């Protein structure tokens, strides 16, 4: 059965327009506001509301009492359901700099979650926040666990994650890191700058 969202202002091409949305076979079809509605269809009246795409959260350390660094597969599901109820349709679990053993445990629990049937937001992959971060701008990161560039370790993590580390936060001023960015990208990881005092020349 098709579903429709009517009378809302739909965010399209950087502006809000009065449109009807038809949801069919998991796809969204944008229709004119006066498009006819199929008999028997489920209709949601969004009058006075804005309709936007689901948000993708690439930096989530936890929610509903769950800390990603200690989360089980079942805990990830709690976050998925909470996120979906608050407008986030996809997310990355952000693993803080931790011991090798704990980071591997986080990866393993993520993989278990991927094999579960679940509802809610889609857990797209893993975001590693560290361990290649500046001690000067460490924030909440445990300084004794921060490291210089270590591609063998990152490759080991990515192999264990079966390619599901999607994003890493690094401080480019950390010794050896700038030269390793191309190799990180070759592993399928998007590289972001954080916990950094890097200037334009870096």
Where would I find each of the regions flagged by the language model?
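Histidine-rich, glycine-flanked metal-binding segment
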Residues: 1-6, 10-52
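Di-metal (Zn2+ and/or Mg2+/Mn2+) metal-binding site signature of metallo-dependent hydrolases
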Residues: 49-71
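Divalent metal-coordination and catalytic microenvironments
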Residues: 8, 26, 48, 59, ...
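Histidine/acidic residue-rich metal-binding segments in metalloenzymes
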Residues: 113, 147-202
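Glycine-rich phosphate-binding loop of ATP-grasp-fold ATP-dependent ligases
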Residues: 136-145
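Divalent metal-dependent hydrolysis catalytic cores, especially in the metallo-beta-lactamase
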Residues: 61, 77-106, 121-134, 161-173, ...
């Amino acid at each position: 059965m098709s579903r429709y969202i009517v009378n809302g202002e739909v965010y399209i091409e950087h502006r809000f327009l009065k449109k009807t949305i038809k949801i069919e076979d998991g796809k969204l079809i944008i229709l004119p506001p006066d498009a006819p509605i199929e008999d028997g269809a489920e209709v949601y009246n969004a009058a006075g509301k804005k309709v936007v795409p689901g948000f993708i959260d690439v930096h989530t350390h936890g929610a509903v009492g769950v800390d990603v660094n200690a989360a089980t597969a079942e805990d990830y599901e709690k976050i998925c359901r909470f996120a979906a109820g608050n407008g986030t349709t996809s997310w990355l679990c952000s693993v803080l700099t931790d011991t090798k053993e704990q980071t591997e445990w986080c990866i393993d629990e993520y993989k278990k979650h991927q094999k579960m049937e679940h509802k809610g937001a889609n857990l797209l992959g893993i975001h590693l926040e560290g361990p290649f971060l500046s001690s000067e701008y460490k924030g909440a990161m445990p300084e004794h666990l921060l490291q210089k560039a270590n591609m063998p370790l990152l490759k080991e993590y990515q192999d264990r994650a079966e390619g599901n580390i999607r994003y890493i936060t690094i401080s480019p001023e950390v010794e050896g890191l700038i030269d390793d960015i191309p190799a990180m990208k070759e592993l399928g990881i998007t590289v972001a700058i954080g916990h950094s005092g890097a200037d334009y020349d870096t």
